[in-house]
């Protein structure tokens, strides 16, 4: 809260009190350990970071504390962090797994800078090891997308169609109400999401500055499929009229037998943004990504994947010519 904190020392004699004061001031002069700073960051993060994100940070935070918990944060260097990341890489961790540990360290160090425990952030300059395996972004096949577009757009069937044509995350779509859908302006207002705490759905409304809060363009293909007339309530309610439980959602989705996940439809949407020539800066206003670096990275991945596919096709064509000759 910015106010000075008072600490009281007790002892059997004035000499013992002085000794305790000297020990305390000596420890204070050394600075806080990363574990102590992390406790403050976690308390703040619980108020500001989404529940699902915090859940994803739990194991990475444990790994960071195991490596650096007792280190004075002012003694932590970029080289220390890079050595930690290389050790993870040697264990066979994928790029995303290693990257999240760096993200956690970066957040802790940023917190330390704001509170005067650091003057610079050693995590910002740290680089990921080269050669890390990247988890492949699975784009749905044309057959899978055809199954989606052939669904009758009623009830829960509308969900995969909406995910494909808007790129909404599952939680965002599950929180949508008909009042959020403006057919005339061709806009869907995304202002909240459903988080699952175990099986229990919890609707979380975002602040105006939240990255996920956005207006998504209703494409002509989706406009044709959305029901006309005024409707109220959730687009995809559960049996009790409120948000679906996690179990209800899984059952409904499995019954569709699409053979793909909701998030794969988000990948398909982003791919179509790229193929349509939508600039990354504009695309992120539709996808809700929090920074342009992430959006550009996704675009680069799509381009590289398409280049690799083109190479395969050309090689197959060349080999066909060799067989003919």
Language-model region placement:
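Active-site-proximal segment of tyrosine recombinases
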Residues: 172-174, 260-261, 270, 277-289
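Short, polar N-cap/turn motifs at the start of nucleic acid-interacting alpha helices
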Residues: 180-187, 278-298
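Basic, Lys/Arg- and aromatic-enriched nucleic-acid-binding interface segment
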Residues: 95, 99, 114, 118-119, ...
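Active-site/catalytic core of tyrosine-dependent DNA strand-transfer enzymes
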Residues: 143, 193-196, 217-259
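N-terminal core-binding DNA-recognition domain of tyrosine site-specific recombinases/integrases
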Residues: 9-10, 43-119, 134, 242-248, ...
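DNA breakage-rejoining catalytic core of tyrosine-based enzymes
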Residues: 7, 74, 117-120, 129-150, ...
């Amino acid at each position: 809260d910015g106010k000075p904190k008072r600490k009281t020392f007790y002892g059997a004699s004035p000499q013992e009190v002085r000794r305790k004061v000297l020990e305390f001031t000596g420890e204070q002069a050394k600075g806080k350990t990363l574990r102590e700073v992390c406790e403050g960051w976690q308390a703040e993060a619980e108020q500001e970071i989404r529940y699902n994100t915090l859940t994803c940070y739990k194991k990475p935070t444990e790994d960071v504390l195991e490596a650096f918990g007792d280190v004075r944060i002012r003694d932590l260097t970029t080289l220390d962090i890079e050595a930690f990341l290389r050790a993870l890489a040697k264990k066979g961790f994928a790029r995303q797994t290693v990257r999240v540990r760096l993200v956690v360290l970066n957040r802790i160090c940023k917190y330390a800078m704001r509170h005067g425990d650091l003057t610079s952030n050693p995590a910002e300059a740290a680089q990921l090891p080269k050669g890390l395996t990247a988890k492949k972004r699975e784009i749905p096949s044309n057959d899978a997308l055809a199954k989606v577009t052939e669904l009758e757009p009623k009830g829960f069937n509308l969900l995969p169609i909406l995910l494909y044509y808007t790129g909404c995350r599952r939680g965002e779509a599950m929180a949508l109400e008909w009042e959020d859908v403006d057919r005339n302006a061709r806009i869907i207002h995304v202002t909240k999401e459903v988080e699952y705490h175990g099986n229990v759905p919890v609707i979380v409304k975002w602040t105006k500055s939240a990255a996920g809060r956005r207006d998504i363009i209703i494409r002509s293909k989706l406009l044709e499929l959305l029901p006309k007339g005024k409707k109220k309530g959730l687009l995809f309610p559960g049996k009790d009229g409120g948000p679906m439980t996690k179990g209800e959602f899984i059952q409904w989705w499995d019954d569709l037998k699409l053979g793909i996940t909701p998030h794969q439809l988000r990948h398909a949407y982003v791919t179509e943004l790229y193929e349509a020539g939508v600039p990354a800066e504009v695309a992120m206003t539709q996808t809700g990504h929090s920074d342009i670096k992430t959006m550009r990275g996704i675009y680069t991945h799509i381009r590289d994947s398409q280049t690799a596919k083109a190479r395969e096709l050309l090689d197959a064509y060349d080999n066909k010519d060799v067989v003919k000759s």
